[in-house]
Design a protein with these regions (language model features):
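SAM-dependent methyltransferase catalytic region
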Residues: 1-161
Length: 161
């Protein structure tokens, strides 16, 4: 298991992502449409988030991977004054879940150190096929950070080609 440093948690998140990428063959990642977002892009995307009126910011990450987009978004929310963030993450690749959980653990610790709250739900399923938009009990989201898999969906039969 990866040991978190107390000095630079963002660097730790990048290290977690790198270790996961190095653990998978390129062909396997291609078959799943996995092309992970880097820190510069995820930080830029997060910088576009404005402080909403809600007390708790709700983030949707529909292709979570190792969680770098959620991490950047949550940390930006904390930086601009939001002390409560709830993330709902979908990740199709079961093998990515340990790295994703490590990232979310780091985010929780950062929030706790600032007397703030970070909570999350992880779903190991295909966001497109799960159709959470059809569930009337699902709360809306303030932020969606999405780097979806790169492959074609078979609209007629569900699943991807």
């Amino acid at each position: 298991m990866y040991q978190q440093s107390l000095i630079n948690p963002v660097s730790d998140i990048v290290t977690i992502q790198g270790a996961f990428l190095n653990s998978k063959a390129l062909e396997e990642r291609r078959n799943l449409g996995q092309f992970f977002t880097g820190l510069v892009v995820s930080d830029y995307m997060a910088s576009l988030i404005e402080l909403p009126d809600e007390k708790t910011v709700r983030i949707l990450d529909a292709g979570a991977g190792t969680g770098i987009l959620t991490a950047s978004a949550a940390l930006h929310c904390l930086k601009i004054g939001c002390n409560s963030v709830h993330a709902v993450l979908y990740e199709l690749d079961e093998k990515a879940l340990p790295a994703l959980e490590q990232t979310l653990h780091i985010i929780r610790k950062i929030f706790q150190s600032r007397q703030a709250s970070f909570t999350c739900e992880i779903y190991c399923e295909d966001f497109v096929l799960a159709r959470p938009d059809k569930n009337t009990s699902v709360q809306s989201f303030d932020v969606a950070v999405i780097n979806p898999p790169y492959f074609k969906y078979n609209v007629k039969y569900g699943g991807f080609i």
